[in-house]
Regions:
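Intrinsically disordered, metal-sensing/regulatory segments
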Residues: 1-247
C-alpha cells in the first residue's frame, strides 16, 4: 500500500469516527457546544463556495467533452442540475423532520409515521455518507493538500449532521443510527479504493454533493429555531476561507 493510499484510508476511518464518537465532542456549556457546531457549518460551507463550486464550471466543461458522443439530454447543464437535485432532495429529507409535518402524522392517527420519517432520513444520509467517502478516495490522487482540505471540511460537516440527528432523535440515533452512518463512510471508502466509476459519473456526483452540503448546513444549523449563531458561523466561514486561500 502506497503512502497516499494509507493516508486516504486513515482519513476515511477518521471520518467514520466522527459519527461513532461525535456525541462526546461537546462542551459542558450548551452555548459553547452550539458555537462549535455553527462554526463547523460555516467552515464546510466555505469549502463548498471556495473550492467545490469553482470546480463545478471546470467539471461541467469536462463533462461536456467526455460525453459529447453519448447523446445525453442537456449535457451542458448536467453538473449544475445535479447540484440542484442534491439541494432539493435533501431539502425534502429535512422538511420531513419539521414539527408541523410530524404533528400531521399524529393528527391523522399514524403513530408510526415519525419512526418512518427517521428511517427515511437516515437512509438518505447513509447513502450520502458513503458517497462523500467514495469521492474523497477517488479525489485523493490530487495530493495530500487536496485530501486534507476535503477531509477537514467534510469532517466538520459530519459533525453538524451527527449533532442534528442526535439532537432530534436522541437514544434512537445513538443506539444504531450513528453506527450505520459510520459503516456507510467505511463502505464508501472501501468501494472507492477498488471500484472506479466513469469520470463523467464522478463529476455528476460531485455536483450532487455540492448541492447537498449547502442545503444540509443551511437547514440543519442555520434555519430559524435551530439556535445557530451568526458570529460563530461567520468565524468558521472566514477562518476556513483564509486557510483555503493560503494553501
Amino acid at each position: 500500500m502506497s503512502a497516499t493510499q494509507l493516508q486516504t484510508q486513515l482519513a476515511v476511518v477518521m471520518l467514520a469516527s466522527v459519527f461513532l464518537f461525535g456525541k462526546w465532542l461537546r462542551f459542558r456549556s450548551e452555548s459553547r457546544s452550539r458555537q462549535w457546531i455553527t462554526a463547523s457549518a460555516g467552515a464546510s460551507v466555505a469549502y463548498v463556495w471556495l473550492h467545490i463550486i469553482p470546480e463545478l464550471s471546470e467539471a461541467q466543461g469536462a463533462f461536456t467533452s467526455l460525453t459529447h458522443d453519448m447523446r445525453l439530454p442537456l449535457p451542458e447543464f448536467r453538473i449544475y442540475l445535479s447540484a440542484l437535485l442534491g439541494f432539493v432532495l435533501f431539502y425534502g429529507l429535512e422538511h420531513m423532520s419539521w414539527p408541523n409535518v410530524r404533528l400531521a402524522g399524529r393528527d391523522t392517527g399514524q403513530p408510526r409515521r415519525e419512526n418512518l420519517i427517521y428511517k427515511v432520513r437516515l437512509s438518505g444520509f447513509v447513502a450520502y455518507g458513503g458517497l462523500v467517502s467514495y469521492l474523497m478516495v477517488r479525489d485523493s490522487n490530487r495530493g495530500i493538500l487536496s485530501l486534507l482540505t476535503f477531509f477537514l471540511a467534510m469532517g466538520l460537516h459530519f459533525i453538524v449532521v451527527n449533532h442534528s440527528f442526535g439532537e432530534e432523535y436522541g437514544d434512537k440515533y445513538d443506539h444504531s443510527g450513528r453506527w450505520l452512518l459510520a459503516f456507510a463512510v467505511l463502505a464508501g471508502g472501501f468501494i472507492g479504493t477498488f471500484a472506479l466509476l466513469p469520470e463523467h459519473t464522478i463529476l455528476t456526483l460531485l455536483g450532487f454533493v455540492a448541492g447537498a452540503v449547502i442545503e444540509n448546513n443551511t437547514m440543519m444549523e442555520l434555519a430559524k429555531g435551530k439556535g445557530g449563531q451568526f458570529w460563530a458561523f461567520f468565524a468558521g466561514a472566514m477562518g476556513y476561507s483564509l486557510l483555503l486561500v493560503a494553501i
